[in-house]
């Protein structure tokens, strides 16, 4: 009886282990690569009235690089299993803090992108939403002196937000 019980337990464990699928990801993505193999990332045009020239290419390249570095998805020009598209809708600066003399002490720079995400294999995950990133700098500095650094910082934050919403699903 002990031997039959042991064999039954062993067969049950084997059946459970082969029926269960465990997937570990150390990069934050939550992708079933047996179903999702490709991603299509369109260029995001700038639709903002205020523009900094390098912002568009910087954003588009960083977004593609983010997916390339953090997933095994193959980037394609069309018919991707996942599709990420949208536009840069806002880039602006506004006074943030006031000094004791009544003048602006800090300026906030913000960037907003509208994203349309399509999962052709699981349409219930499709969405369209806006993501915003901000950065603050002292008014004693000129925008031209800090713009590249701040836009790069905001682009990284936006790419993280988009990645998390699309494939990490946090």
Language model features with spans:
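Second-shell loop/turn segments in exported
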Residues: 45-52, 141-149
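A structural "domain/chain start" motif
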Residues: 16-61, 65, 72, 164-170
């Amino acid at each position: 009886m002990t031997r039959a019980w042991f064999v039954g337990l062993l067969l049950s464990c084997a059946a459970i282990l082969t029926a269960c699928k465990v997937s570990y990801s150390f990069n934050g993505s939550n992708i079933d690569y047996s179903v999702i193999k490709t991603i299509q990332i369109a260029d995001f045009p700038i639709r903002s009235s205020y523009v900094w020239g390098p912002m568009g290419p910087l954003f588009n390249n960083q977004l593609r690089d983010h997916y390339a570095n953090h997933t095994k998805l193959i980037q394609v020009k069309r018919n991707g299993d996942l599709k990420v598209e949208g536009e840069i809708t806002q880039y602006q600066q506004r006074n943030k803090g006031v000094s004791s003399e009544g003048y602006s002490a800090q300026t906030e720079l913000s960037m907003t992108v509208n994203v349309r995400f399509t999962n052709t294999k699981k349409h219930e995950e499709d969405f369209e939403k806006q993501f915003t990133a901000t950065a603050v700098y002292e008014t004693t500095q000129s925008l031209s002196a800090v713009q590249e650094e701040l836009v790069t910082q905001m682009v990284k934050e936006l790419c993280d937000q988009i990645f998390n919403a699309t494939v990490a699903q946090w």
